[in-house]
Amino acid sequence: MKQLRHFVHKFLVDHFPKFMIGREWKIQFGEKLDWNNPKTLNEKIQWLMANADTTEWTRLADKILVRDFIKEKGFGDTLTELYGAWDRAEDIDFDRLPEKCVLKCNHDCESIVILDKSKGFDKQEIIEHFKRCLVPFGYGSVEPHYTRIKPRIMAEELIPMDKTVDSSSLVDYKFWCFDGFVHNCTPCYDRKGLDMVCDINLLEPWRLYREGLTKEYRESHVFKDMPAPPNLDRMMEICRVLSTGFPEVRIDLYDTNGRIYFGEMTFCASGGRMRQFSQEYQEEMGSYVKLP
């Protein structure tokens, strides 16, 4: 019975995505999505997922293929070094990998393995891990454009920590962009697995805007006042160029030890069902999304 439900769910996402997107919204928020008058950022992301051509979303959400796009736009210097890419976990060439690197899939967000040969590692355990990860992503969260990405494994450079920044993890600068306009930056820090602290900073000048977060989110997290990244001006220029032509996209960058690194382009953050932003801020950000 479980297999049958899985098959039916997958079939519906593939062939009736708008119905399934609306169904998932109702499950998450307890109300129907207003397809005719979407106002918030979340609502407009749902509309775009269901009604727009998301072919480019699929290409640019692929952590391997997006690298060509970044080079085409003139920002190849922001890419981490790519050590290899494989279709099968058994084909990972551990002998050719450097002492430290990152292994992850190109299509998901939970497969990351930090490889440090100096500390020893279980090769077979890593292979089995990636065998489990090489499955289509996006069906459970009803994000159809992810389901079209061919799952692969990649090995890339480990971005160094910047010890001058007060964070237990790399600070992930997430820029919310609307067709060339960079609206804000959400610096995320003190990451533990998939959990992290995310703030809101407005730009030009860089200034905190926690009013855009829900009261529940503010009360359940310990915040730090993150200074503007040293290379903020160039980061914003990168975001302007990369986001042009897209109604909305979140562009993730790192600024560490004097260098900018590209992270990813995300077109439906949290499936377009984000809960950390207040209703008012959701509507403000949504007002910048021009639907085709």
Model-assigned labels for residue ranges:
Residues 1-52:
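Membrane-proximal basic amphipathic "stem/tether" segments
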Residues 37-119, 132, 136-144, 152:
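A conserved helix-loop-beta module that forms one wall/lid of the active-site cleft
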Residues 67, 90-93, 109-114, 122-123, ...:
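Short catalytic/ligand-binding loop motif for oxyanion handling, primarily in non-cytosolic enzymes
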Residues 77, 168, 177-183, 244-248, ...:
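Coil-to-beta-strand transition motifs
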Residues 86, 107, 157-159, 177-179, ...:
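Short, flexible loop/turn elements at secondary-structure junctions
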Residues 97, 124-216:
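Phosphate-binding site of ATP-dependent enzymes
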Residues 148-154, 163, 199-260:
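A long amphipathic alpha-helix within ATP-dependent nucleotide-binding catalytic cores
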Residues 237, 255-292:
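C-terminal active-site "lid" helix and adjoining low-complexity regulatory extension at the edge
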